[in-house]
Amino acid sequence: MDMTKKLILAAWALLLAAAVPAQQKEEFRLWPEAGKYAPERLGAGFDRDNAPYVTLYRPEGKKPAPAVVVCPGGAYGGLAIGHEGYQVAEWFAARGFAAVVLKYTMPHGNYDLPRRDVQQAIELVRANAAGWGVDPARVGVIGFSAGGHLGST
């Protein structure tokens, strides 16, 4: 194949990739403020580094969808949230799942903190199932490394 045909094919591939719809992505506080259970979208004053939150990836297509809470690893000292969180959620959303990436609390010796976060994330998904297009009876958890341990507790 000559160079011109290769360039044309590459250009078409890029155009087609750009035409694929991106999954809808939204971020919410994990823990409600002042007794509210409805999720609150993250605002400008939110402490992203220290407070737990979830990132929801909605799939295109049929509703209600099954959901999966994604717990990234990081040895309970940090989070590999890019490749073990957001990329995994995009993969699930492209296959018809709602995916919720959990940015959980670092335990600093108190492992009840992240355990409560994953339990809260599951409850948050179930409580908002109708608005998020999720089947509340089909909510699972997946995790990597420390996130896998967290998801199993």
Predicted regions and their residues:
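Active-site glycine-rich loops that stabilize anionic/oxyanionic intermediates
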Residues: 72-77, 145
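Gly/Ser-rich "nucleophile elbow"/oxyanion-hole loop immediately N-terminal to the catalytic nucleophile
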Residues: 123-145
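Alpha/beta-hydrolase active-site loop
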Residues: 110-131, 153
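Hydrophobic h-region of N-terminal signal peptides that target proteins for export
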Residues: 12-21
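Short beta-strand element of the alpha/beta-hydrolase
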Residues: 64-74
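N-terminal cap/lid segment of alpha/beta-hydrolase-fold proteins
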Residues: 23-66, 111
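Short amphipathic alpha-helix adjacent to the substrate-entry channel of hydrolases
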Residues: 81-100
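Glycine-rich nucleophile elbow surrounding the catalytic serine of serine-hydrolase chemistry
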Residues: 143-153
